[in-house]
Amino acid sequence: RKKFKDKDLLWLFDDIIDSADGLPIGNYLSQYLANFYLTYFDHWIKEVQGVTDYFRYADDMVFLSDSKSFLHKLLHNIKKYLTEKLNLTVKENYQVFLVESRGIDFLGYVSFHDRIRIRKKTKQNFARKLKRGADKSTIYSYLGLLKHGNCINLKNKL
């Protein structure tokens, strides 16, 4: 309401957000609203908290640091900020870990220092769909994922 003054637009937002289903996952409006709503958080995390290595897509976030204690303190500050300022909560499935050994699972890929792989589950789903005779659009979608995931051997097997 700070940014939008148009009554019709505000009514539409209220109607969508307050509906029984809430914002549908994957809907373009959901992505835009999440990015818009979390813009203040983005500024706070960088300017006030001094975080330099931070990635976010909608409500999925990754923070990088050499210090686990810094990340734990940051997590505490994030929970407080999101609760008090934006009326949001952090799911309890967050993780703080060293990335050298296991990589970062984010947006369908697992990223390591020297390579990017697609998730194991994604590979399994793709193989299953190929066996069942998936349509062209599904196959091309998966091939697009493989293209960005250092998956030359997997592509050759297929």
Labelled PLM ranges:
Residues E47, E84, D105:
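Short polybasic/polar patches that bind polyanions
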